[in-house]
């Protein structure tokens, strides 16, 4: 596989650590490499709105925010309902109305679940499957030069 540049590495776009979601701050790059720390998924939507992440980053942040939502529900920090899970996805989809890829991807992710238990059990694996698909595309593009 072609090693992706900094701006395309998943851990540098968004990652979860110590109960927080960290989003790579594209506004500061290339002068500095820093992250914006997010405490709830609605802050992730605000970060996308304010340009913390750009290009394909909003989609990846939205996907990681769905895993983060699962984590917060497990920790009792968000209401344990399917409506909470779906509501986060809808709020993320709404922040960039012209980003139809983000909306379609989140809709496809949600359509796989009929209840909260399914979502909680499968969201992380499903998100990583989607990200692996992006990796394959980036690899093919990288081979083309």
Task: Report residues per predicted region.
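Long amphipathic alpha-helical segments
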Residues: 3-120
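Small/polar-residue-rich loop-to-helix segments that shape phosphate-bearing ligand pockets
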Residues: 102-145
